[in-house]
Regions:
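Catalytic metal-binding acidic patch
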Residues: 113, 120-147, 164-169
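Well-ordered mid-protein domain cores that form the structural environment of catalytic cofactors
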Residues: 67-126
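Nucleotidyltransferase catalytic cores
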Residues: 1-91, 178-182, 188, 195, ...
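Basic- and aromatic-enriched surface patches that contact anionic nucleotides/nucleic acids
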Residues: 152-156, 173
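Short, charged/polar micro-motifs that form catalytic or ligand-binding hotspots
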Residues: 40, 102, 134-144, 325-332
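Short, conserved secondary-structure transition motifs
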Residues: 163-185
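Amphipathic alpha-helical scaffolding segments
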Residues: 129-135, 139, 146-152, 340, ...
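Arginine/glycine-rich "motif VI" loop of SF2 helicases in the C-terminal RecA-like domain
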Residues: 156-162
């Protein structure tokens, strides 16, 4: 082929002729044919058939050809006549195929192009085929939809031939108007870029069939007058309009497009960095050199000038030349070196190997370039041995790549802001792309960094050694990762792959980055820990079942929503013996208690440490280590917090514990606990629901509840402290839910809380000989309890019911307009029937029984020091704080004692209490909770009865 021919000049003012236009068209077609031949030769025999028959399957709607849907699907490519090679390829696919004359039917399709890297230096075996299929502008929506379904079917067919095919269906006039149908997907830039994509199309596309680009015929110096020139060519019939397709000019790239295009290249760069680095730097180059012509213009200028050599016009050669000229100077040498490495690795052609001879033109061209760069054979060998790259190599390279990608994004974002332009990318698309970038590159606490985004084929190691730092002396508590360390003594001289504060993080990092596989040999030097190879093997099995490798990218739908946890894996007691302190004493089990959170007679909590691994909807993997304080409760609190924002879909919780003897029991108990806690808080896929969840663990009680969307917990050191806390006032009704193992020695209390209801005052009692236990659950779920002597079953509830009746009567007087808001009283007896504790309803028949004696009332008052004191009325006799001061209680006790006719000691019961509305000095309480009245009643009664006993 002739590389240089005479230049062509078109002067639209002086006049043009059809013969010159045909020569110009044929010159572009000559370059086009060279690229098609190169693209064809790079494919395998089976893959070549896909490229050969692609125009034919859209030109004909033949049922024997791939992609056929139905007889109504649009078909026919303008001015297309299949070659003998194409017909033969079709017959190889379908023996019944025969070419029929369609007559003069108007074709539905204008043109078909292949664009991107095929036929270029950058094409590799992994490259895909991006096809533009352009339909006529008046095609109905139903026909367009049919073409899109046919394209999708062809994509699946091509996949069976080892070809990744993407066919984009659109109309040229819609393209010019910016009405693209597609959104951002894996292979579509959506709204992110228009002119940049058109610039790439004009300099890389291969015409497959149909109309030719009108852009070919417009001189590069006339790009600004594109529309006028195009109209002259058509109106004066220099060309037939149906022979050409018009995508419009690319005089320059609008500034507002740079941000969208930059974000898009970052999106692509997550999985294919080499190509994206080149494109991102080209975008930056365009943005910084706005006065210089675009590469598409340079390509067209070269063809007009007479250049037809495919090497010189290769899009990647031209791209590199532009970037090399722009990045001149020692201060940017590192960026230029990254560009060269990216181009070499994008080509995927290892020059140090003999088998590249089948890629003669690419090998020759690439060899010329690396020779010009002054690369040594050592550099080539390093790049050609990508499959032998280690984690350390990839980490360094990834850092360089991420720095370059983020540098480009920040620069473009800054430029877009400075020019005050709206980015040429929809808000939805930029949000979507930003989320993917965040998920891939953003560092945050606990996140497991993915170090190999398509940089090396594999980082798998044959042998990994995990060494506890105490093995090397000192009291350090971290872990070191080595490779091929057969002799532990060599650790002092071997490089460390990675250091970590805990073993689980090191294991998860190795697994997620592919260093650790089932075939990797493991070595453990545990030092002061008890980790073992068997524990690591079990951990690897748990990780493999929990998380796929490699971690796939998140789907568009997931990125369009807020991030949420999908599932959690809890690794319990990694490298820890939870019974070490018991074993030292020769103790293993001192009672029949099997609960792992209150094990044996010592009520030992066997959960010492937890490593929580979370896999979220953006496909980020993170690890949180809990080893100090109340580890299980802290972990539970964090899981609850992560669910609160999206309770409709509860994350899965898997638990693994290796510990010999009790490992499976510990894992089962922890898994039960998480399920039991999540269920009531988020029942029905909503929540968090208002409740208080009580867990008994390690001889203590933990009470979990939400404040809005924030979970919190209170640790209580004793049963008495728990009961005091449950009696405290609430802002709204909060029922008490007990964990399945909590307070098993208090079945009556569990039955009380199970029977509690909102907007009621419930009195529960249980008689035990001459003593009774009473509980009152008030209108907001606060629980108050006390013991009382039983002198008569009939009179047992009378004092408290009389007290509550007086309280309710006073509330009714205040709420005359809304009597329904005042809670009534219901009574229940706690009984055991058929081995089950339950609350049985008892009518309030005793409330009207008269009691001997007189009314004892207390009226609370606040003095200057804000201490709450009480004036007490015994019948008509008043005992005031002002008169009696600290001697008020003894005086009342003495008075009551003086009125009794016998020496028998029996308790005094208050019949009513008035509390001030400023009981809490910080707020004004319109309605004081029943539990608060019961508390002060109990305090006063206890004090009075103690003094009565003394005055005997």
């Amino acid at each position: 082929l002739t590389a240089h021919v005479a230049p062509i000049s078109l002067d639209f003012e002086e006049g043009i002729d059809r013969k010159t236009l045909r020569r110009l068209r044929d010159r572009f077609l000559l370059v086009n044919q060279q690229r098609w031949d190169r693209a064809h030769s790079a494919l395998s025999y089976r893959q070549q058939m896909v490229l050969e028959v692609l125009p034919l399957v859209f030109h004909l709607n033949h049922p024997a050809l791939p992609g056929y849907l139905d007889s109504d699907c649009p078909y026919g490519l303008s001015n297309y006549k299949p070659s003998p090679a194409t017909i033969n390829a079709a017959r190889r696919l379908a023996r019944t195929f025969s070419l029929k004359d369609e007559g003069k039917r108007k074709p539905d399709l204008d043109a078909m192009f292949l664009m991107g890297s095929p036929g270029t230096l950058g094409h590799s075996v992994a490259s895909d085929l991006d096809v533009w299929l352009c339909h006529r502008r008046d095609l109905p929506e139903r026909g367009i939809g049919c073409l899109e379904r046919k394209a999708a079917k062809l994509t699946r067919w091509a996949e069976s031939f080892g070809v990744e095919l993407h066919v984009f269906v659109f109309c040229a006039s819609d393209w010019r108007a910016g009405r693209q149908r597609a959104e951002v997907t894996g292979e579509n830039c959506g709204s992110a870029q228009h002119f940049l994509l058109l610039d790439e199309f004009y300099r890389t596309s291969i015409h497959l069939a149909g109309a030719w680009p009108m852009w070919w015929l417009i001189p590069p110096e006339q790009e600004a007058n594109y529309d006028d020139c195009m109209r002259k060519l058509v109106d004066f019939r220099f060309v037939r309009a149906e022979d050409y397709i018009d995508f419009g000019p690319v005089p320059t790239i609008p500034e507002e497009e740079f941000l969208g295009a930059g974000v898009w290249q970052l999106y692509k760069g997550i999985d294919a960095p080499w190509k994206s680095i080149l494109k991102l730097l080209l975008i930056e180059c365009y943005a910084r050199t706005t006065g210089e012509p675009l590469l598409s213009s340079e390509f067209k200028r070269a063809v007009f000038r007479g250049e037809t050599d495919a090497d010189s016009l290769d899009p990647y050669v031209m791209l590199y030349g532009r970037l090399e000229g722009w990045l001149a100077g020692p201060e940017v040498a590192s960026r230029l070196d990254l560009i060269r490495r990216s181009l070499y690795l994008k080509a995927g052609l290892p020059l140090t190997r003999s088998e590249v001879s089948g890629e003669q033109w690419r090998a020759r061209l690439l060899r010329q370039m690396v020779t010009r760069w002054g690369w040594s054979e050592c550099i080539l060998a390093e790049l050609d041995e990508r499959q032998r790259w280690r984690a350390e190599d990839v980490v360094t390279l990834r850092r360089t790549i991420v720095n370059e990608l983020t540098h480009g994004y920040r620069l473009l974002s800054k430029m877009a802001r400075e020019h005050g332009q709206r980015a040429a990318i929809s808000a939805n698309d930029i949000n979507l792309l930003g989320r993917k970038l965040y998920a891939a590159f953003q560092r945050k606490a606990g996140k497991i960094e993915q170090i190999n985004p398509g940089l090396a084929p594999s980082l798998a190691e044959e042998n990994l050694a995990f060494h506890h730092q105490s093995e090397q002396g000192g009291d350090s508590d971290g872990w070191l990762l080595y490779r091929d360390l057969e002799d532990p003594a060599d650790a002092f001289w071997q490089p460390v792959i990675r250091r970590s504060g805990n073993l689980a993080e090191l294991m998860v990092w190795c697994y997620c980055n592919g260093l650790l596989t089932r075939s990797t040999r493991l070595n453990v030097r545990s030092g002061t820990s008890i980790a073992s190879v068997s524990e690591l093997r079990e951990m690897l099995d748990a990780l493999s079942a929990f998380l796929p490798f490699p971690v796939p990218p998140a789907e568009r739908e997931a990125l369009s929503r807020g991030v949420r946890p999908l599932r959690n894996l809890l690794l319990v007691n990694v490298g820890v013996d939870p019974q070490a302190h018991l074993t030292e004493k020769g103790l293993h089990k001192l009672s029949s208690r099997h609960d792992s959170l209150g094990f044996s007679g010592g009520r030992e909590n066997l959960v010492i440490s937890i490593d929580q691994i979370t896999f979220n909807s953006w496909h980020e993997v993170s690890l949180q280590h809990y080893a100090a304080g109340d580890t299980l409760i802290q972990c539970l609190k964090n899981v609850l917090a992560s669910v609160a924002a999206n309770p409709a879909e509860l994350p899965g919780v898997q638990v693994h514990c290796h510990n010999r003897g009790h490992g499976s029991a510990i894992a089962r108990r922890v898994q039960e606990l998480f399920a039991d806690v999540l269920r009531p808080f988020f029942a029905g896929g909503t929540g968090p629901h208002p409740l208080r969840y009580v867990i008994e663990m390690d001889r203590r009680y933990f009470l979990l509840q939400f404040n809005g969307l924030e979970p919190g917990f209170v640790a209580l050191e004793s049963f008495e402290a728990l009961m005091e806390y449950l009696a405290m006032p609430q802002e709204r009704y909060l029922p008490v839910v007990f964990d399945r193992y909590a307070l098993q020695e208090e079945p009556a209390l569990r039955a009380v809380c199970l029977a509690s209801e909102p907007d009621n005052i419930q009195v529960f009692y249980r008689i035990l000989g001459d003593q009774a236990r009473l509980w009152v659950v008030d209108e907001l779920g606060s629980l108050f309890s006390w013991e009382q002597a039983v002198t008569s079953r009939r009179h047992l509830l009378v004092p408290v019911l009389r007290f509550l009746d007086n309280l309710i009567e006073r509330r009714l007087l205040r709420h005359t307009d809304s009597a329904g808001v005042v809670a009534g009283v219901q009574c229940y007896e706690i009984v055991r029937r058929d081995g089950t504790w339950r609350a049985e309803y008892r009518p309030e028949s005793d409330s009207g029984v008269p009691l001997p004696g007189f009314e004892v009332q207390a009226v609370g008052i606040h003095e200057g020091d804000s201490r709450l004191r009480f004036d007490i009325f015994c019948g008509d006799q008043e005992f005031s704080v002002q008169e009696y001061g600290d001697q008020l209680i003894p005086a009342v006790a003495h008075y009551i004692r003086s009125l009794r006719q016998s020496d028998e000691v029996y308790p005094v019961y208050l019949t009513d209490i008035h509390l001030p509305h400023d009981l809490d000095p910080r707020v004004y309480q319109q309605d004081i909770q029943t539990s608060q009245y019961l508390y002060y009643r109990s305090v006063l009664e206890d004090s009075l009865n103690r003094h009565l006993a003394r005055t005997r």
